[in-house]
Amino acid sequence: AVDTSASYFNFGSLTLSGIIKSVSGYALPNASATVTYGSSGSKPSVSSDGTFAADIDSGSDTTVTASMDYNASSKAITSLDALDALKLSVGLKPSSGTADAYDFIAADFNQDGKVTSLDALDILKNSVGLSTTQSPKWVFIDGNKDYSSITKNSVIYANGVSLTDVSADATANLK
């Protein structure tokens, strides 16, 4: 997740600062942030606690995105993830007991907009080290948006956070 806030300066510029976190709230210092405004952009460094800062022009439309390489040796994807994806694909609850938008986004492994048994199979293959057409990747989305309309048949979201006409303090949350 990326929590960003902008502070107004009298010099016609803003400082956009934030922190990149996982859905569970852990800082992700190995992630990278990209801040794009107008025709300019920057890749601020991310510190060990996951924070970053970038200067932007006041009044600009700004997009903040985050990315992070997936480390296959971390074994972060397990057969339980495959089981949960399979459960979601047939309308059952995952092992956590409740399904939310983040579960559907994570389960849509091939990113075709729906959760199916093929996603579960690819997750299972990946968890045991077999190759798949799609590689696992981190997805960072705007944590302030309402994703309650996401279902197993409609996994639609935009990467990053868009801030329009940033001319005063602004806050965005990217998970």
Regions flagged by a language model, labelled:
Residues 8-175:
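Cellulosome-associated attachment modules in secreted, modular CAZymes
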Residues 2-5:
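Extracellular and select intracellular beta-sandwich modules with Ser/Thr-enriched
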